[in-house]
């Protein structure tokens, strides 16, 4: 049976490439909207979709068909039908867009942190349905948490889809109310809401996604796909040393070890000698593949599978980083970072031990010292060696990883210099690395 989501067409790979994070609260319609986007851009297998629609009809849940596209794709992936990590993509007139980390994953917020560090742009999905909207941006709302995260991770390009407009009868007043509240939140985070597109959509009915809807005559702006076309692809840092955080590793019979990840900086070519750290194992690149197509070389932004000779699967794990022996990725003994405390019930002091999520790695860490507290607006120090910091504070801190992990200065390698601290199932803080004290690494 064909995969429900089609691989990129040859035309797609000629276009500039953008990684899109789809964020928002549970049940606000992210999966349905992604399914709809894939369908509208010709990336859903018609035969497989018909099967799904018939199944949905049988149980009286026709509205579920688009969301089920992703469910079906996830099942295929779990059964090993598709290798691609968690990436699906679609094409607009000007761009090829990869959706990173599909919504609905139980570790979505955690993945958001690792995933969004790869995002060039974000689609924020918010439901106009009374009750759902308020829950999403309330103090406990995931919608709110996701916006804080994409801000901290440096995502500048955002579009807001005000979804489920069909449920509120395409009421302009409700749309304006949602827009005003979300704008307030965006402003608080330092975005300029006047530069962000808000679009009234219905993922289920298809309003304003590919074509202008007659149901919203009061809306004169662009469609969702038109806004995507206005996104600027990032400058890809090809001239920096190679860094590729590893997302996954597996063995293919007859081929050997394959590591999957996204090239963040530098260039990787077939035949290159590479090193994977912290384990400090050296190997050679046999082949590189992206979306089932062979590549001679990979550049920043490429999501790839790399067949490595000389390195065993058990020597490598998610969170390790692939580089070159002449510029080995830095394993951190200690880091100095600027953090913002997003949520904490009491206060944080020296000795606090959360879990750090950095690129694709997850490690236990300890805050060893609070160096200074900063004024969030100016970035100037207002207090040296504070005893504690609390929610809303910005501070410079020293952090010691309790297990080996690769970490780089944010100014050198942004994707490897951004992190989140988590505890109690919540994101406590997000930060940027200012200094790294390197650990000794013996290349084997």
Curated annotation (Swiss-Prot):
The gene is tuf. It is an enzyme of class 3 (hydrolase). Signal peptide: none annotated. It comes from the Archaea. InterPro entries: EFTu-like_2, EFTU-type, G_TR_CS, GTP-eEF1A_C, P-loop_NTPase, T_Tr_GTP-bd_dom, TRAFAC_GTPase_members, Transl_B-barrel_sf. One of its GO terms (molecular function) is translation elongation factor activity. Its main location: cytoplasm. SUPFAM superfamilies: EF-Tu/eEF-1alpha/eIF2-gamma C-terminal domain, P-loop containing nucleoside triphosphate hydrolases, Translation proteins. Residues 101-104 are annotated as: G3. GTP hydrolase that promotes the GTP-dependent binding of aminoacyl-tRNA to the A-site of ribosomes during protein biosynthesis. This is Elongation factor 1-alpha.
């Amino acid at each position: 049976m064909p995969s429900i989501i089609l691989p990129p067409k040859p035309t797609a790979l000629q276009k500039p490439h953008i990684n899109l994070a789809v964020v928002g609260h549970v049940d606000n319609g992210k999966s349905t909207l992604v399914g709809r986007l894939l369908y509208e851009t010709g990336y859903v297998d018609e035969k497989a979709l018909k099967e799904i629609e018939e199944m949905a009809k049988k149980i009286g849940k026709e509205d579920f068909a688009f969301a089920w596209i992703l469910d079906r794709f996830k099942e295929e992936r779990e059964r090993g039908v598709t290798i691609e990590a968690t990436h699906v993509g679609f094409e607009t007139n000007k761009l090829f867009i990869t959706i990173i980390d599909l919504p609905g994953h139980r570790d979505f917020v955690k993945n958001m942190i690792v995933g969004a560090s790869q995002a060039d742009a974000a689609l924020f999905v918010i439901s106009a349905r009374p009750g759902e909207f308020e829950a999403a941006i309330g103090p406990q709302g995931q919608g709110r948490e996701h916006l804080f995260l994409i801000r901290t991770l440096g995502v500048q390009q955002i579009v807001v889809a005000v979804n489920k407009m069909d449920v509120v009868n395409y009421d302009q007043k409700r749309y304006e109310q949602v827009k005003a509240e979300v704008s307030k939140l965006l402003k608080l985070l330092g975005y300029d809401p006047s530069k962000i597109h808000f679009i009234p959509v219905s993922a289920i009915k298809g309003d304003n996604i590919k074509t202008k809807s007659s149901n919203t005559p009061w809306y004169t702006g662009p469609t969702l796909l038109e806004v995507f076309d206005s996104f600027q692809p990032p400058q890809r840092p090809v001239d920096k040393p190679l860094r590729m955080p590893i997302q996954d590793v597996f063995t293919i019979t007859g081929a050997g070890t394959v590591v999957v990840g996204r090239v963040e900086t530098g260039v990787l070519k077939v035949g290159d000698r590479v090193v994977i750290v912290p384990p400090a194992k050296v190997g050679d690149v046999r082949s590189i593949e992206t979306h089932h197509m062979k590549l001679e070389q990979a550049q920043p932004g490429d999501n790839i599978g790399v067949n490595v000779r000389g390195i065993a699967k058990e020597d490598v794990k998610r969170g390790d980083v692939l580089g070159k022996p002449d510029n080995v990725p830095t394993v951190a003994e200690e880091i100095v970072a600027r953090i913002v405390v997003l949520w904490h019930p009491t206060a944080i002091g020296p000795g606090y031990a959360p879990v750090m999520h950095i690129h694709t790695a997850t490690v236990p860490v300890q805050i060893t010292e609070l160096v200074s507290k900063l004024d969030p607006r100016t970035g100037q120090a207002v207090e040296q060696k504070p005893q504690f910091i609390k929610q809303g504070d910005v501070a410079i801190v020293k952090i010691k990883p309790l297990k080996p992990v690769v970490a780089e200065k944010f100014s050198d390698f942004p994707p490897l210099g951004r992190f989140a601290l988590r505890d109690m199932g919540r994101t406590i803080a997000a930060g940027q690395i200012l200094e790294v004290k390197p650990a000794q690494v013996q290349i084997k």
